[in-house]
Amino acid sequence: MKNYLIAALWALCILNIEAQTDSTTRHRPWLAVGEAAGINAGVWAMNRYVAHAPFAYIDFKTIRKNFRTGFVWDNDKFSTNMFLHPYHGGLYFNAFRTNGMSFGWSAAGALGGSLMWELFMETEPPSINDVLATTAGGIALGEITFRISSSLVNNHARGLERVWREAAITLISPVNGFNRLLRGDMWRVNTLRDAWSNEESHQTCATLSTGTAWLSPNGKLFKGTINGFLKLKLEHGDLFSKPYSAPYDYFEVQADLTIRQQATMGDVSLLGRLWSHDRESTPGKKLIWGLFQHFDYIVKDTTSNNRRQVPVQISGAAVAGAGLIWINAPQSDPVKLKTSLFVNAVLLGGTHSDYFSVLERDYNLGNGYSIKSFNAITLGKYCRIKLNYHLMHLFTWRNKIDSLYYRTLDPHYLDVQGTQSNTLVHVIQGGCDVALSDRLSASLDLYYYRRESRYDDFPMVTTNTLRMTLGINWWLSNPRKLSPASML
């Protein structure tokens, strides 16, 4: 199973090997390899000489042992495996992307960087789930941060504008900022315009939302916690009027911070077009079908009676599949409709487990499928009603924890996906946006999360969680009123 999963990642890289490159940047493959290796060396050095982490004390014996042991399912905490590893993969990806390499070669670079870390850079056995999450999640986060940061490039800018642009580029994609510094592009003023900053073909619509969020971990209407939230939504490219040209020429991003005593990441959802074809029957009516990549990281925490609960814990770190989108938006018609359906394979997903707790892991890993549907109707220019549904069916196969031998084994070598089970996760979202001006709108959203975990050796567990948000949205750039194409 593990070999098949890694082979699937290699196939994804090879299929996209000739995908679009950055034509304005000279190809520097060896520099890209060196930077990816340097990222690993830097992280290892921090752990070895600053943090003195036990796993960083490597030598030739530990490397040989890793090759002999092979890949296992590790027991790191949810945020590490399902978000930080994909972010790390995005750094590998951009080491190649920002050195002029294609999407496919950059995907291969993310896989290579992950394999280098797992096999050579730590004493713990190599992790198959880390390779999957780092590569697939790194492709999504890497290409998105590359395109967003590159769209901010303006080689004409001077003074304060140039400073904030270069700072934003580096914040969004540290590797892109590093390479611009290395090449001297960060301060060089010229008349050349970067290929990725073409506003005509790479428009970005960004909205920032803030407000109040109510969360009930037990599904009870009048019991729960109230916190603030800060949400960023990005729609990059034009799905409605621009045909497919390259992977991720269209993508959407939604990132949600929960504001309590401190801000905590609670929701990251990504949708990127890998390939598509479309047919427009009449002006304003278009049917689009193709392949799409998804990334989901959803954690909703609450504290009640001095006890921490985890009502929602969902991850789709390696997800891709087919999608069908129908848009009915004639320019003269005040009522515009969008509906979509995505059927995906889940190479790696994760959900909360009620019976598994080893080291830092309290969740199940697994494979399965997911179905997503996004639906919205826009009434005039000032009101949009939406109804979205997300189903994930995750199967946890590998579990040897009941064996006496595995109970006495070093837990780092346990090699289990979790408690053997199959889990259905349902996420239903309904909401309404009302525009207040060209750049301001108010929104009310309701969420229902349901988890049905059927365990082979334990009683079934069902959880229900309700969430409601009331907020104000501010269009940061390119206000499009209420875009009928936006799906997240």
Segments and roles (model prediction):
Residues 143-144, 212, 228-238, 268-280, ...:
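Residues on the lipid-exposed face of transmembrane beta-strands in outer-membrane beta-barrel proteins
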Residues 182, 464-488:
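Outer-membrane beta-barrel "beta-signal"
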Residues 296, 310-411:
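Detector for outer-membrane/organellar transmembrane beta-barrel domains
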Residues 137, 202-204, 222-232, 264-270, ...:
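Residues that define the transmembrane beta-barrel architecture of outer-membrane proteins
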Residues 104, 148, 240-244, 282-286, ...:
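Repeated loop/turn-to-beta-strand initiation elements of outer-membrane beta-barrel proteins
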Residues 173, 206-212, 249-257, 289-297, ...:
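Transmembrane beta-barrel strands of outer-membrane/channel proteins
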Residues 26-53, 79-120, 132-149:
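Hydrophobic alpha-helical membrane-anchor/signal-helix detector
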Residues 218, 305-312, 355-362, 412-419, ...:
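Extracellular loop and loop/strand-boundary signature of outer-membrane beta-barrel proteins
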